Structure formats: structure tokens, C-alpha cells
Regions:
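Short hydrophobic helices that act as membrane-entry/anchoring signals
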Residues: 1-11, 67, 71-74
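Short amphipathic alpha-helical segments and helix-helix/interface helices
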Residues: 3, 42, 67, 91, ...
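Helix-to-loop junction immediately C-terminal to a conserved catalytic motif
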Residues: 3-33
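Structured helix-beta-strand junction loops
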Residues: 9, 24, 49, 72-73, ...
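Glycine-rich, highly charged phosphate/nucleotide-binding loops
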Residues: 10-14, 82-88
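Short acidic-hydrophobic, aromatic-tinged amphipathic segments that line or gate anion-handling sites
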Residues: 15-16, 76-79, 163
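Catalytic core of membrane glycerolipid acyltransferases/transacylases, capturing the structured
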Residues: 22-82
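Non-catalytic C-terminal accessory region of glycerolipid acyltransferases
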Residues: 25, 86-202
Length: 202
């Protein structure tokens, strides 16, 4: 959080919906993904330490500086093709700490102004860990890998979604809320991750 004042200095932030942040309980921060700075933006908006799920390839194919950045964010490697028991165990370990979990349900960065191709894994994790999902939208940096100085970025926090809903309902509500907040088009599609196991197996 040392870098937070620098973000406020160099960028124009608008943060909406902080009143929707649950108090006194764990939850999953689930946002759309439009730039490399999204994890920092979500952490600034929520004002809590967040450990982010990241594809395992990021820990293998990038340089030291990039690796230090994702380590600083508390990121841990996951297999995007198949949700593994080890991932659920890592999430449950977070319950013993003051950290929250951060997920980008669409997987990689998407700048086509749509909410689609949502991975089912975040809903499985929410139900397995019994953590509600906090939908978050990020807009204003869709054209850039890194946000140019002076750009206006809006982070909006939606209403928490109960983990007690079915997986399909969780996915639907997340997609609808983020699309509404970002003014993106919501396209209902089948999950990209067909190998996700039912949460009862964990």
C-alpha cells in the first residue's frame, strides 16, 4: 500500500460503491479485467490486502520485475484449465489471515467492452469457501496495457452476491452487475472451464 499515494497523484480515480463492502466477514473480490494495473486498482478501492489468483504461466514466463510485482500482490499460481484441490486449500488458508481473495472471472485481459466467457471456477470457490462474491467493475483503461498518466479510471463496487446461490445464479448475477456498472454488453455463454469439479468434492 506504499504505492497508493502515487496512484492518486498520477491518475484521476473515481471510486463508487464503497458502502457495499461487507464488514466483519470474508468475501471474494471479483472484477472484470482490462489492464495490468487492475489488481492495484481493486486493492485501492477495497482498502484491504487481497491475494490474487494468477495463471501459473505468469510465474514461469516473465522477468524478475514482473515476478516481484505479482509476489507483492500476494498472487498464487492456479491452473486455469482445471480447478485443483490445492487451490481450494490455499483459499481456506486465507480465512486464517486478514487477506481477502481476488479473482478475475473472465481469465485474461479483455478490452472488447463485453462481459462474456466467464469461468465457472470463481463460483465453485465461493461455494466451497462459503465466501460471498463482491462484484467490481473497472473502466477507463481499456485501450492500454498500463494506464497513461492523467487518465480517469472508475472503479465501482456492486452489491455482494451470496455464496448460497447456485453456481449458475452466482455467475449470472456477477455478469449482470458488472455489465450494468461498466455499461458493457453482457453475453451469456457457457463456461470456458468445463473441467471444474463440484464444490462438494473439496
Amino acid at each position: 500500500f506504499i504505492a497508493i499515494p502515487l496512484f492518486w497523484l498520477f491518475y484521476r480515480f473515481e471510486i463508487k460503491g464503497r458502502e457495499n463492502i461487507p464488514k466483519g466477514k470474508k468475501f471474494i473480490c471479483a472484477a472484470n479485467h482490462v489492464s495490468h494495473l487492475d489488481p492495484f486498482l481493486v486493492s485501492i478501492a477495497v482498502k484491504k490486502p487481497i491475494a490474487y489468483m494468477a495463471k501459473k504461466e505468469l510465474f514461469e514466463d516473465n522477468g524478475l520485475i514482473f515476478r516481484l510485482n505479482i509476489d507483492w500482490l500476494g498472487a498464487f499460481a492456479v491452473n486455469r484449465q482445471k480447478l485443483e484441490v490445492a487451490t481450494i486449500k490455499t483459499v481456506k488458508e486465507l480465512y486464517k489471515t486478514n487477506w481477502l481473495l481476488g479473482i478475475f472471472p473472465q481469465g485474461g485481459i479483455r478490452r472488447n467492452h463485453t462481459i462474456e466467457k466467464i469461468n465457472k471456477g470463481f463460483a465453485v470457490i465461493a461455494k466451497a469457501a462459503k465466501w460471498d462474491v463482491l462484484p467490481i467493475s473497472i473502466t477507463g483503461c481499456e485501450k492500454y496495457n498500463w494506464i497513461p498518466f492523467g487518465a480517469k479510471v472508475t472503479v465501482q463496487i456492486g452489491k455482494p452476491i451470496s455464496y448460497e446461490l447456485s453456481q449458475d445464479e452466482l455467475i449470472e448475477q456477477w455478469g449482470q452487475q458488472v455489465a450494468s456498472m461498466s455499461h458493457y454488453k453482457y453475453i451469456e455463454t457457457e463456461s470456458e472451464n468445463s473441467e471444474v469439479q463440484d464444490q462438494q468434492e473439496f
